[in-house]
Amino acid sequence: MTVRGTIPPSVPSGHLPHKGGDHIVPQPLKSLPWLTRGCLLLPPISPLMGEMSAKLTEGGNSPRKPFDPLDCDMAAEWAGPRPSILQSISDAPWRTQGDTVERIELLAAELVDGETACPESWPNTRMVLSEIASKLQPSILACGDAEISALLKGLDGRFVPPGPSGAPTRGRPDVLPTGRNFYSVDSRAVPTPAAYELGKKSAELLIRRYVQDHGEWPVSFGLTAWGTSNMRTGGDDVAQALALIGVKPVWDMTSRRVTGYEIIPPAMLRRPRVDVTLRISGFFRDAFPEQIALFDKAIRAVGMLEEDASDNPIAARMRGEIARLEAAGLDTASASRRAGYRIFGSKPGAYGAGLQALIDEKGWERRADLAEAYLVWGSYAYGAGEEGKAERGVFEERLRSIQAVVQNQDNREHDLLDSDDYYQFEGGMAAAAEQLGGARPSIYHNDHSRPERPVIRSLEEEIGRVVRGRVVNPKWIDGIMRHGYKGAFEIAATVDYLFAFAATTGAVRNHHFEAVYQAFVVDQKVRDFMAEKNPAALRDMRERLLEAIDRKLWTPRSNSARFDLESLSKGKEAAA
């Protein structure tokens, strides 16, 4: 039996981990790649905490700023101590804080593997290693048998023991071993205080990045919220949306459930509020009605504030829309209701964003066709007391004015070229906003895999990282080829999703397609592997690359690229 492999969160050195396809289970902890083990171990424990504190008083960017290997400037000069145990771990140059983090990782790997003995004078590290040996390692080893046993019990109609849900790479080793009937979070406690702190930090970094890119304060963002990710994180997306509009949840101190919200005054916020339009998934709609009502009430309350338009564009916009709707004949209550809609999703009972069939079946001519599908599928308004009212015009009005599309990724167990959901929601919103507003909005794909250090990246940057770090990485290709038919399918699916991002956003550059072409078509080893193990996957990949050329999404450097691909279509290369 196999289980889907994982892409762990980025380790502190900033490397993008790769996965080798489906992993055979069970595996000892030592047999896992260090990147996977490191991500399981980093939160919430550090193998060097205590003996070499994770927050040294030396080595930071300034005398007053401590060095934290989980949240530091990797390119900054290292000004701290150079212990002999770290000097001997690598012959590589030691100049930056990133070099220091890399040495700490290498030492941690050797300690976990038992290749380096843990000094007696490091009691805290010895405690952590004992915890790994007594709890984490057995939990990982138990996963395979537990999943097989639970599957057979479920098929036989017998009891499957319950267990918590979450991402083990985000500080939740208690979800191991897998194979249990997992239960979710208490939705009344979402967003959690921890999620709000992450959401607040991410919101501030997002605003800072926008100001750096555009030289002005942002006014309106479009944000996607998925149910599964918010279950794993305790509500990162909801928390970020609340932080952007300048609102903080209020929790009951006993139950830790959310009981309301607090509007942060401009003097404390120290920046303008940002108008946020939420595009929720169908599962989010079903699982988090309290959070829908919370955000709806909060943004309407912010819209009623008597604040300057420069501080509160939400209120300025709502006042203007109410006046316009009243002039068109609506009563004040109806006008206020429509002007306050900020949460949209698919109609009740429906799921997805509506783009997958168009992409798969080539049922579109222009990007406007994809935008239309996104608008038709997601133009139903939700809120407190509102459960999917058709409001196409209001949805269009919201998307017409958004300046940035925001998508958060809560873990590194997958990437944006692993799933069709990212291009459908993120790409669909971008296509619709471009079609309605006449200009392509900025697109930010944020990394929340390490709660202590959220990272804001543009979609172009994220696609570049994934293409270089995973898609055309020889280590990933060698690993995926070990799995025959399914490995070839994964390669073709990755090319599909890359093409879909090019179609919806234009964020895929020629060199991205060129790298894929060189890795999967020009490389005879990979081409022959796909032809032998999964000819259908090779055909699908070839057709997708030819479609990219035909639609002018990719202009190959080589004049022979089309000929090579068409030769495959005639079976010449497949038979060679």
Range-by-range predicted roles:
Residues 3-10:
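Short, exposed "boundary/linker" segments that immediately precede the start
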Residues 23-33, 54-62:
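Short, tandemly repeated low-complexity microdomains enriched for cysteine and small residues
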Residues 1-2, 63-576:
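Ligand/cofactor-recognition surfaces for anionic moieties
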Residues 20-21, 50-51:
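Glycine-biased, low-complexity coil/linker segments
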Residues 35-46:
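Extended, structured, electrostatic nucleic-acid-contact surfaces
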